[in-house]
Amino acid sequence: MRPTATWIWHVSDAWLRRTRDFGVIRLEDFCFQFNYSQPRVGYCRVPLKAWCSNQGKFAAQFTLKSCEKPGHEKFITSFTAYGRTVQQAVSKLVEEAVDFILFRATQLERNV
């Protein structure tokens, strides 16, 4: 029996479709409140032979960046979430990102 070949695949801007549905507006509110750049949430279908295909049929991706001054954004971290549907993947991503933003705000406040 031959092993099934899987290949390295990652979410990339070339594959993404942008969305503001499924709670993204809530994420936008948190980004604005805590001075992060406007979020650009995207989603795509996960290829069947990709290493992460067992995580879900769809992947959602978002990169959190600081908004110190226009044109000078700093990368903070990125998020990828998977789901059986676009809605599930994007909703999961929004929840994880909002939780992180709140956690980071608490930690930064504690260290001031």
From Swiss-Prot:
Name assigned to this protein: Non-structural protein of 12.7 kDa
A Pfam match: Corona_NS12-7
Family: Belongs to the coronaviruses 12.7 kDa protein family.
Domain of life per record: Viruses
Gene source species: Murine coronavirus (strain A59) (MHV-A59)
